[in-house]
């Protein structure tokens, strides 16, 4: 009703942006007439205006018009009006929902250029190193042309390289590199070791993937912990002897294990221990993890085993997460289950969730093809509003209703039949699967059917060809199996992708012997190019790795002055022209057949991920279609669907190989997905609420560390620590003064011991003092003791006291914080049980976390004061 009265709020917002688009378009002819130099000079004019407090919103129309003209001159790409709208949404610190193929990468350049004019640095975040490098080298040429600097952060870079790249006006990086650099900066011992500048503006590509899907996985830097391999192995053996529903129950919704009374007794019997929960010799966590590994974590679904190592598979992208480990002993339990070497437990040194990390930016924005379904969460946790950007061309994709089968066998047979039909027609098909295991099941089925296909899953041998496989998934007759959203970031072009075909051809021409090459047979142009390239390479002394690097650079659009790379790029352009004409013909045939057909093999727990898969078809107004094939044995229906669906199938007496298309079933499916989304949203919200408590403490500790690093003289800092410690003692003394006759002697003994005073303090004199007099008297003793200690230390080396102050302060803060993180983790694990005592676990957690933090800060002060005042200089002969 409100929408009828007031109209669609999204359309009203777009209407406001269109007015600004008209202003940008009005400047287009003027900027077209400018020379390159004149266009580049506009950057200096904008910077000057902003330094005089010009509002960025007022600069926006001119800055966007300049960036659009520069993009056309440098890349040959002109921003469409809808891309200008996307840029405005990002500039305002919102999320722009833009469909697949609408040019998000190009859109990010507009707000990045505008905001970089302020001089504080803009971060553009992508999901992997490849995309970060591709975008920096390709669209990064636009701000470079306009006089701004562009940086790139990649895995394996040195500290100096990182520092240099973060200092640029616009920096491309990945979410994990950015987060880990933040944590490492807050563990730095020297100010010059810090690589990042203060945060200003961040644009996140695939924002839903990072802020929603990865929100439950904290970034953790850890150090070596205890070695308890035997316990994991023993617990794994015990778990094999425990019987499901007798000794333990599995809660698949919560992904948790509940041990029954008989399970506790049986475990204690097999382990020959009296109490699983004994604090001195705890076994409970080992048994729980062993059972989780047995029941909830499946090989080739949740992880793969490669070279005797358990590697996590990202449940949302299907990619392997090399170097990432499950925490709290779960990873070791899975290693024991798979009978591979169990790595040592680790102790957390620093951690942060993506939720709290990205909230550190004063201005945050993001782009994705699918955010509307998570709008409430993005607004509540990140205060990010989602605005849908209209497509440049009308959407033509047909989304067919789901086909639901009684069992898995009938479903997979039907999928294979559909693939065969499409392949026979010549229509390209992309099949999305939810795990490595299921992708390989379908692959073996298609082999039986004689259907040629490409397989893309988390297995390393497949992942190497990821971009190439996805890029060619739109060719006539192509059949591509991909786990989840593998290949996200690479467009599927109907008829194929001439760039990838040209790159592949260039690789073959450079590596095949002319006399043995079947590739160049009957093609004089390729034969001529083959001979020319091989003669050219012979004049350079270059190994295969170097050649591979030069081919990669030649096939990208970044600037290069290397002679061989320029030659390779020229050859690459010739090959692109050759394949473009071939593709144009094939593209017309594929369009006539109906475009790309996407098959979903299971509904994901999130509607958003289903929409991402569907979104691979019908890009930029192309035709396309999608259909999901489901079975009652699929996890979503089995765990969350309830008995309603099963009863309906039984009532209808449906044959196993006959699918059902039913509005009631579709509603039940959507209801099941909403239940799961609500469940995981609650889990992320709870994680956020608990981590927010730790986050306030983290910010306090990190800001204290930073002030210590930036301070040239920490004398007053240590004296303040000492005075606060003295205050604690005095307050305790005056509380106990009347009830404890010897309290003056006791408190003065402690203070003498703490400060290492070379003389005794008089208890009788002390008892005559008021509280303020006692404080002033002891503060005076602190300064006397400190002056004495400083003169002793500086006898060894002048200025040594200043170095000791910084070293002791950082050392104690870091060690105390490490212990505190462990205590907070233990508190978090145990606090849930308070709910059974009619107490709110979150309030209990906040109260106890505050007590732990207060205790930690007191401990830091006491330890630093003791270390400095009691340190004994050793003079060399």
Curated annotation (Swiss-Prot):
Alphabetical keyword list: ATP-binding, Chloroplast, Membrane, Nucleotide-binding, Plastid, Protein transport, Thylakoid, Translocase, Translocation, Transport
GO cellular component entries: chloroplast stroma; chloroplast thylakoid membrane; cytosol; plasma membrane
Organism, as annotated: Rhodomonas salina
Family: Belongs to the SecA family.
Subcellular location field: Plastid, Chloroplast stroma; Plastid, Chloroplast thylakoid membrane
GO biological process: intracellular protein transmembrane transport; protein import; protein targeting
Record-level Gene Ontology MF annotations: ATP binding; protein-exporting ATPase activity
Binding-site list for ATP: 83, 101-105, 491
Protein name per the record: Protein translocase subunit SecA
């Amino acid at each position: 009703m409100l929408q009828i009265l007031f109209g669609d709020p999204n359309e009203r917002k777009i209407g406001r942006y269109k007015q600004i688009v008209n202003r940008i378009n009005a400047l287009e002819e003027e900027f077209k007439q400018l020379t390159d130099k004149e266009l580049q000079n506009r950057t200096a004019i904008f910077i000057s205006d902003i330094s005089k407090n010009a509002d960025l919103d007022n600069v926006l129309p001119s800055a966007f018009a300049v960036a659009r003209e520069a993009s056309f001159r440098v890349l040959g790409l002109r921003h469409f009006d809808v891309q200008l709208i996307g840029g405005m949404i990002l500039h305002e610190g919102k999320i722009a929902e833009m469909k697949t193929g609408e040019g998000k990468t190009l859109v990010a350049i507009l707000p990045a250029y505008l905001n970089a004019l302020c001089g504080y640095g803009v971060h553009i975040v992508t999901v992997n190193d490849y995309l970060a490098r591709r975008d920096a080298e390709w669209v990064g040429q636009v701000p470079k042309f306009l006089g701004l600097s562009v940086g790139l952060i990649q895995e394996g870079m040195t500290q100096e390289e990182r520092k240099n790249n973060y200092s640029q006006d616009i920096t491309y990086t990945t979410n994990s590199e950015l987060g880990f650099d933040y944590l490492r900066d807050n563990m730095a011992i020297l100010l010059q070791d810090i690589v990042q500048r203060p945060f200003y503006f961040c644009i996140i590509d695939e924002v839903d993937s990072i802020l929603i899907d990865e929100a439950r996985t904290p970034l953790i830097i850890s150090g070596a912990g205890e070695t308890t391999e035997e316990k994991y192995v023993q617990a794994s053996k015990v778990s094999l002897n425990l019987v499901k529903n007798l000794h333990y129950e599995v809660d698949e919704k919560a992904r948790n294990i509940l041990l029954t009374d008989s399970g506790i007794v049986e475990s204690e019997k097999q382990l020959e221990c009296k109490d699983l929960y004994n604090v001195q010799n705890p076994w409970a966590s080992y048994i729980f993890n062993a059972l989780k590994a047995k029941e909830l974590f499946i090989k080739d679904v949740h992880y793969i085993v490669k070279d005797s190592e358990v590697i996590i598979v990202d449940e949302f992208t299907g990619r392997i997460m090399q170097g990432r480990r499950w925490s709290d002993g779960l990873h070791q339990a899975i290693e024991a289950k798979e009978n591979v070497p169990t790595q040592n437990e680790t102790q957390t040194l620093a951690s942060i969730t993506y939720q709290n990390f990205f909230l550190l930016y004063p201005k945050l924005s993001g782009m994705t093809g699918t955010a509307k379904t998570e709008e409430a969460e993005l607004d509540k946790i990140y205060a990010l509003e989602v605005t849908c950007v209209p497509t440049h061309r009308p959407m033509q994709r047909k989304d067919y209703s789901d086909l639901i089968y009684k069992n898995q066998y009938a479903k997979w047979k039907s999928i294979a039949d559909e693939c065969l039909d499409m392949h026979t027609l010549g229509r390209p098909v992309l099949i999305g699967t939810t795990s490595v295991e299921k992708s390989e099941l379908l692959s073996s089925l298609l082999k039986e059917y004689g259907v040629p296909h490409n397989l893309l899953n988390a297995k390393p041998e497949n992942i190497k060809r990821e971009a190439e496989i996805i890029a060619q998934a739109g060719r006539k007759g192509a059949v591509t199996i991909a786990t989840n959203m593998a290949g996200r970031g690479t467009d599927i072009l109907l008829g194929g992708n001439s760039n990838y075909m040209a790159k592949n051809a260039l690789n073959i021409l450079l590596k095949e012997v002319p006399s043995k090459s079947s590739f160049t047979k009957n093609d004089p142009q390729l034969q001529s190019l083959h001979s020319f390239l091989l003669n050219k390479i012979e004049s350079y002394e270059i190994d295969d790795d170097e050649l591979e690097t030069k081919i990669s650079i030649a096939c990208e659009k970044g600037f290069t002055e290397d002679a061989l790379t320029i030659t390779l790029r020229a050859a690459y352009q010739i090959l692109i022209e050759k394949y473009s004409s071939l593709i144009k013909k094939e593209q017309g045939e594929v369009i006539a057949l109906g475009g790309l057909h996407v098959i979903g093999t299971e509904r994901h727990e999130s509607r958003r991920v289903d929409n991402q898969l569907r979104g691979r078809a019908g890009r930029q107004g192309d035709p396309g279609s999608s259909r999901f094939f489901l079975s009652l044995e699929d996890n979503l229906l089995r765990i969350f669907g309830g008995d309603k669906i099963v009863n309906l199938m039984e009532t209808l007496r449906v044959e196993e190989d006959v699918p059902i298309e039913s509005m009631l079933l579709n509603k039940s499916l959507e209801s099941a997905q909403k239940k799961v989304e609500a469940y995981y949203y609650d889990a992320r919200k709870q994680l956020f609420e608990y981590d927010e408590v730790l986050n306030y403490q983290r910010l306090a500790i990190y800001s204290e560390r930073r002030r210590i690093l930036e301070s040239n003289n920490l004398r007053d800092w240590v004296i303040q620590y000492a005075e606060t410690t003295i205050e604690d003692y005095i307050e305790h003394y005056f509380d106990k003064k009347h009830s404890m006759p010897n309290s003056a002697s006791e408190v003065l003994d402690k203070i003498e011991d703490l400060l290492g005073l070379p003389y005794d303090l008089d208890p009788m004199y002390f008892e005559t003092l008021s509280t303020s007099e006692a404080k002033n008297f002891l503060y005076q003793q602190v300064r006397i003791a400190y002056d004495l200690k400083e003169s002793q230390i500086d006898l060894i080396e002048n200025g040594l006291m200043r170095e000791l102050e910084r070293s002791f302060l950082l050392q104690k803060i870091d060690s105390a914080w490490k212990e505190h993180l462990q205590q907070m983790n233990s508190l978090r694990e145990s606090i849930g049980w308070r709910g059974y005592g009619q107490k709110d676990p979150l309030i209990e957690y906040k109260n106890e976390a505050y007590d732990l933090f207060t205790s930690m800060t007191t401990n830091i002060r006491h330890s630093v004061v003791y270390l400095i005042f009691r340190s004994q200089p050793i003079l060399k002969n």
